[in-house]
Amino acid sequence: MKALNFITALCFLCAIGSAQAADNMKAFPPPGDGMVRYVLQVPKQDDESMFKVELIVGKTVKLDKGNRYFFGGNIKKETIKGWGFPCYKVGKLGPMAGTRMAIDPNAPKVNRFITLGGEPYLIRYNSRLPIVVYAPSDVEVRYRIWRASPEVKMMGKG
């Protein structure tokens, strides 16, 4: 009997979480023509201030293995009017640039995920709201979770 009560309570909690996520998605408009809406719901953490989410935007392209490439472009944070929720918009990726090391012309090309150039784009970790990114349909959005070490060190004076 206790197991049945536990399972019932667990199902109820899952349904509430799912309903909340669905309610939150009502705030985010559908993507426009030629755009895709990416959605990430991160799991709850005990201390979410110790985490960040890195948004990684790019395309998979067939290239040589030796050079370093990147796209021009940016990620812009916007706020959904009337809701106050953040969303992120990626415009068209600019031209691809890269190093020009001499590579064997007969070397096979490989599929590589080429990202936006510049610093990593880190955003606040928040399990209560979905992370929503609007991007062109030919662009991929990936992510990485960063976690801070609980150890804090003293910095020297000088």
Which residue stretches match the model-derived regions?
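Bacterial N-terminal signal peptides that target proteins for export
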Residues: M1-I7
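Bacterial N-terminal signal peptides
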Residues: I7-A15
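Sec/Tat signal peptide C-region and signal peptidase I cleavage site
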Residues: G17-A21
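Compositionally biased, non-globular sequence tracts
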Residues: A22-G34, Q45-F51, V61-F70, L93-P95, ...
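Short, surface-exposed loop/turn motifs at beta-strand boundaries within globular domains
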Residues: P31-M35, E48, K81, R124-R128
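Short, well-ordered beta-strand segments enriched in hydrophobic/aromatic residues
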Residues: Y38-L40, V133
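Mature extracytoplasmic domains of secretory-pathway proteins
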Residues: S49-G118
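C-terminal partner/receptor-binding element of secreted or periplasmic proteins
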Residues: R124-G158
